[in-house]
Each structure stands twice: as structure tokens, then as C-alpha cells.
Amino acid sequence: MNAFVVWLESTTLSRGIVHYRWIWPLCEIIHFIGLTLVVGIAGFFDLRLMGFMKRVPVSAARDLMPLAMAGFLMNLVTGAAFFIGTPHQYVGNVAFWAKVFFLLLAGLNAMFFETTVGARTINLGAGDETPRSAKVVGAVSLLSWLGVLYWGRMLPYIGNAF
């Protein structure tokens, strides 16, 4: 892994991210906006799946998901920029790997939802009860995104401090 880190830090892209002082703060702003979209919308949808806000049809909550995906793409690009800029601060940081774990868990949970539970819940209207499996998926998703938030916030304080 060290050879990869050394190579990545020697690239023009990595040096540019660190050298141009406006890139990092701009990426942080975009990352925060993206995270707000992802966690806000996914959290709203997850809470509906868990049985809260029953006055909202599941399809109405799901209609916001393209915005959540846009936020996720914003985070993917800016997160990659953070990693490329200073990979040595991430590869040995337990908080980074915990964040990656929760991101993967959220993704696998979303795939599980789409391939199993989603078809049974998408047409639920206002007042309809969601199946227990949907409630579990919603809870796992919400906890996954909270894990992403927590471990992402802990990055500067745990492991290789920034």
C-alpha cells in the first residue's frame, strides 16, 4: 500500500489538489451539500419505511431519490479528491475504513431493497403499513448513513491526524 500512496502523492492531480488552496475548501463545501442531500433524503425515506410519517406515500418519498443520487455523486467525486490529495492520511486511518465499511453496508442494503423488498413497498399509499422486512431495511440504511457521518467526522481525530 505504501508504494501506491507514494505514487498517488507524486501525481499532478494529487499535488494540484494540495497546492491550489481553494480546491480543498471548495470540495468540503460540495461534500457537505452532497452529504446533506444523501442523508436528508435517505433518512426521510428510511423513516417512512420504518413506519414513521405514514401520511406520506412511499412513492412520494422515493421520488426524491434522484436528488439523493446526485448528492452521492457529489460526495464520490469530492471524497476521491480528498483521498487523492492526501492518501497517506486515509490508508492507515481506522476511521476511513470504518466509513468505507458503512458506505458499503448502505450500498448493499440499497441493492437488497431494490431486488427484494422494494417491489412490495413502492405502491404503498398514505396510511399503509410497511412490511417488517422494509422496516429492517430502513433501520439498517439509517444506521449505515449515521455510521458514515460519524466516522467521516472522526477522520481528523482518529488514526493519522490531519
Predicted regions and their residues:
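Polytopic transmembrane helical bundles with strong interfacial aromatic enrichment
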Residues: M1-F162
